[in-house]
């Protein structure tokens, strides 16, 4: 019992010291151009935490200074790279609200998509190789919306090519989730729900493997409901897909 108390106390002390060591450093009251130069050097070095410290000091001390908009853009990037994703989201929303016509607004939209993708990801599950397709894709949907708006609104943006590639990945992610839901309804014999779910997949994600994989679930659901004519139509689609692969 004494040993357990010692271990708990030691763990608590370690957490306290870690919190102290991670506290923000004081930024000298230098001219804004010097603080900005220091922040840029920290960004180039990949020292995201110290870059954030410098940039936040600039943002707080000179909110309407000559570097204000660039500081906000740099903070978005630094927060994202440092995995401070809620802070990145807040900085993005703030920038769009205050600067809706900024020439780099396409970059901010791109960063919002990246941030939502990162929020959808799970480092722990990814490390252990856990399939994430059945998790709520709230942030994946948001990222899909972000990148779609970027591609439609700024087709000539330098970020559009990468955004388009990410849309393919996100479409597959969302379709896999819908497939997992259709499987869930199949296991419970909720045949109408299965049909409705797969119909949604055919409408929203027709060119994904998950949608093709869901067609047998739809066929089976129709047969369970004695709707054989509809089941035969789905069976023909399945056969046509098989002949084209």
Curated annotation (Swiss-Prot):
Part of the Bam complex, which is composed of the outer membrane protein BamA, and four lipoproteins BamB, BamC, BamD and BamE. Forms a subcomplex with BamC and BamE. Interacts directly with BamA. The Bam complex has the shape of a hat, with the BamA beta-barrel crown in the outer membrane and the periplasmic brim formed by the BamA POTRA domains and the 4 lipoproteins. The N-terminal may interact with various proteins as a chaperone to assist in the folding and insertion of proteins into the outer membrane. The C-terminal region may serve as the link between BamA, BamC and BamE. Belongs to the BamD family. The keyword Membrane applies. The keyword Zinc does not apply. A lipid is attached at residue 20 (S-diacylglycerol cysteine). This is Outer membrane protein assembly factor BamD. It is a lipid-anchor. One of its GO terms (cellular component) is cell outer membrane. CDD domains: BamD (cd15830). Disruption phenotype: Depletion decreases the density of outer membrane proteins, but does not significantly affect transport of lipopolysaccharides to the outer membrane.
